[in-house]
A protein has these predicted regions:
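Juxtamembrane/disordered regions of integral membrane proteins
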Residues: 1-177
Length: 177
């Protein structure tokens, strides 16, 4: 394993909540910029709004970190209640992804929009139907891969990276639409 990868794994293992905050703050803003570049829509955040937006993304990273831990425990409890004693890691990852994106995902997305509205002084929930649909065609497959990783510490960072990918896909779709 390369030195930088090992350094990353050490940092996210040692400081999981701080790492979740920073990863989402940085990658969330990068996703906003990529989506705006693809759609041709200019982002005009002053420094104060920029910091508020980063704060919002960072808080979302903390919520996702806790949500992933909770959904892992939930999936283990379902296995226990159904007396599933064996099964593939991929099955567990798929079930955890399905539970996460069915029970946790919609509320997290609505919270994220509410938080954006609050921090940026905007209103509205336009486009939430499209966002919710991504849970099934994008996030369940993406998180199945994410949750199949043996190192749970890197899952939040990968989720933040998946957000960049989704932003790019949606930006291209909006541009063509």
């Amino acid at each position: 394993m390369s030195g930088i990868v090992q350094w990353y794994i050490d940092i996210v293992g040692r400081y999981p909540f701080q790492a979740a905050f920073v990863q989402f703050a940085v990658l969330g803003m990068a996703g906003d910029w990529i989506a705006s570049a693809v759609t041709g829509k200019k982002i005009s955040y002053g420094p104060f709004k920029f910091l508020k937006k980063m704060l919002g993304w960072g808080i979302l990273g903390l919520i996702i970190k806790v949500g992933f831990a909770g959904m892992h425990g939930f999936t283990l409890a379902v296995y226990d209640k159904l007396h599933i004693t064996s099964g593939s890691d991929l099955l567990f990852a798929f079930l955890m992804s399905t539970f996460t994106n069915t029970f946790f995902g919609p509320q997290m997305m609505l919270f994220h929009r509410w938080e954006d509205n609050l921090l940026l002084g905007t209103r509205g929930y336009k486009g939430m139907d499209t966002a919710i649909k991504t849970l099934f065609w994008f996030w369940i497959p993406a998180h199945t891969f994410t949750f199949s990783l043996s190192n749970h510490d890197v899952q939040v960072g990968l989720a933040a990276a998946w957000s960049l990918v989704l932003g790019l896909i949606l930006g291209i779709a909006r541009r063509k639409g």
